[in-house]
Amino acid sequence: MEKTTLLPGKPNVGNLFSFFAKKKAGLMGKFVPGWTDNKIDALLFTPKTADIKPVRLPRGIDQFVIKTRDGEIQAYQTGKGPTVVFVHGWGGGAHQFFPLMRGLAQCGFTALSFDHLGHGLSDKMPATLQQSIATTNHVLHTVQNSEDGLCAMIGHSTGCITIANARPALVKDRPLFLISPIFNYKLYVLKKLVKLNLHADQVKQYANSFTNTYRSEYQKFELARTLARYGDYTLIAHDESDSESTVADSEQFCARYPLTRLLITKNTDHVRIINSETVWQELKSHLNYDDTTVNFTAKVIYQ
């Protein structure tokens, strides 16, 4: 009997392209392993920028450029007084902090946030952890030498790692407020790797390669190692339902370093926690600001 194959109508061109692209990557990975690793590096550490639109500035927030050794970054500032610097995580942006910044401005602080290289309207390039640390050092140093001076730092996600790995002279004895911190950077990267939907062989090859690179280049940056020296003036805010980073990691750290305060929220997930009322109240307290007359809202008011 003649064998037949049932074809489901017209072939899907997109699927065919994906099929051949993965085949090509698989073959290239066998003959030139570094090629695959470089391509995956680009996918992992270069945020998508095709849909980025100019930021619509909220009322009272100024936008300007900071020139660093590696490129130009977009910065945003409001208020007058001691400066609180906000540091976003991978894939985030300065805009995430606008409501908190507006609130701090009403409390007599200068609030400054910036887009890391590769993010927002800053220069486009791979956004590695080392690059983020270098940029943060530049910003903190600039603020420290400004008229208002550096008062405190607020980080979110991998931005918490960035702050803890900044130059100690810039961080020591200043209040740190860390939101949804990533305590396991290796696991964080491997989770991102899986989400790329690559061929299993490519994932395995890159995971093995990254594990070796992690030991030599990234392990020293892990938050539990570097935050310990600042634990007595750090407050961590973490949501119990956070799917990006488990709250158990924050609980474990605070159990080991009991002077570190821990705020656990409910139903605000990894991102919405930033501009929650609970975080706002704890932030004021952490900065020793007790005036309860300042109203806070997560709603952004534009020009």
Regions inferred by a protein language model and the residue ranges of each:
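Conserved alpha/beta-hydrolase
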Residues: A94, M101-D123
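Catalytic histidine-centered segment of alpha/beta-hydrolase-like enzymes
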Residues: T268-W280, N295
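Alpha/beta-hydrolase active-site loop
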Residues: P126-N145
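Gly/Ala-rich beta-loop-alpha elbow adjacent to hydrolase catalytic centers
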Residues: I154-I163
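Short beta-strand/loop motif that positions the catalytic acidic residue
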Residues: Y230-G231, I236-H238, D242
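An N-terminal hydrophobic leader/cap segment in hydrolases
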Residues: E2-V65
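Hydrolase active-site cap/lid region
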Residues: P168-T213
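Short alpha-helix in the alpha/beta-hydrolase fold that links the catalytic acid
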Residues: L100, L223, D232, T246-A255
